[in-house]
Amino acid sequence: MLQRSLGVNGRKLAMSARSAKRERKNASTAASKCYVVPPSARGWVHAYSVTATSMLNRRKAILDYLQGAVWVLPTFGVAIGLGSGAVLSMIPVKSGTLIDKLMFQGTPGDARGVLIVVSATMITTIGIVFSLTVLSLQIASSQFSVRLLRTFLRDVPNQVVLAIFACTFAYSTGGLHTVGEHRDGGAFIPKVAVTGSLALAFVSIAALIYFLHHLMHSIQIDTIMDKVRLRTLGLVDQLYPESDTADRQVETPPSPPADAVPLLAPHSGYLQTVDVDDIAEFAAASRYTALLVTFVGDYVTAGGLLGWCWRRGTAPGAPGSDFPQRCLRHVHIGFERTLQQDIRFGLRQMVDIALRALSPALNDPYTAIQVVHHLSAVESVLASRALPDDVRRDRAGELLFWLPYPSFATYLHVGCAQIRRYGSREPLVLTALLQLLSAVAQNCVDPSRRVAVQTQIALVVRAAQREFADESDRAMVLGAAARATEVVERPGTLAPPPSTFGQVAAAQAAASTIRSADRDG
């Protein structure tokens, strides 16, 4: 697309852009992405690339909003129902044919009655569906986590069912004005339209049955956790590709020069997304550098520091007056956290389910253990991937843009810390955490990550020693900690099977403690 856009501006310009593209591809390294813009093509390349990328980012943002908007598909359903009803009402059916025998056979009064009954039934059904949907949202927020409401709102099957009901209602209601008499006094019955209304009524019955089936399964805790896990793993693959498994050389963000201009948050909210490509392209064409110091997912207040920007070159200086504003246009702040670029939010959703399960109101430690199992899948993948900041440079190595990402220790802390604190009185929850840490340690290559795992193991041991008065409970946790520590200290060691951390290990620890007490007695 880049060559096609530049081709209209001259063959020389297109060749220059293709050459720049080849040089950029050869000069890219594992540590950063490079943007090379020839001086002759800088204006056109910048205008095209920023516009195209901005449109793509806007489409992603709009799509993310529409996926969570319940009104979109029902609105399309109403439009389709009205349009198809108007078209089918104009289709004549020749009397006496096979098609005529399959169509609605009745008087204009019968046709009007059918359409009224279908319309009234759909209104009642839509009310029932809305009530059940609100009930499921209430269950999700009270039993699991209020941060899961967005997941339920994005549920496409619910939106499709509502769209079918809305389409049937609009189709039948719109068909009422077509039933009547011709100008010559003859009766007019839109047989095709009335038959279509009856067909849509049966489709709506099938949709209602499917909706009830889907709703009963969607509020199950296993289904909810699996959805959150899969979405989080999908984001991990997007931000940290699987092919990029080797740990990169750690880069330290540069210190902003004295005349750097701060990037201040225009309003309060959560940092949801950053259009990295837009800012990097603009910085490459304008010889500026931008550095963010705030993580995606953090809450910022109006006027709070997001980062810095300054002019690149032999004599750095303050950027032009429009550069900070252009950067801020591509830094999106909203009232809620999203999973577009925030892995920690996916971990937070799962942790919230565990904390709600461990609360005195529910007291369901097994659900918390299930959450830890799903967390281990995400944390193990993070342990096996390189987790660099998103750094963009030009071919000369000049920094264009720097977006920081949380470290592995931060991800591990988010997944373990609060569950350890709230589950410190249940030994099986702590052993599940140690099973998680053992699986994570098996995938760690970087020694610093093993240190982070060892720190979490030590914190679990301290919690067990502080909370458990029963020797068997304490022995079970300490034994699991010893097995996890062995995996940490011996790279290449496989994590023990889950049975060594669960109920079997608990029974063995209890029996061993009783035997020891009997011998001592």
Curated annotation (Swiss-Prot):
Entry keyword annotation includes Metal-binding: no
An annotated GO cellular component: plasma membrane
Major place of residence: membrane
Membrane topology type: Multi-pass membrane protein
Subcellular location: Cell membrane
Transmembrane segments annotated in the record for this chain: 68-88, 114-134, 160-180, 192-212, 290-310, 399-419
Keywords: Cell membrane, Membrane, Transmembrane, Transmembrane helix
Segments for region (Disordered): 1-25
Record-given protein name: Uncharacterized protein MT1328
Source organism (scientific name): Mycobacterium tuberculosis (strain CDC 1551 / Oshkosh)
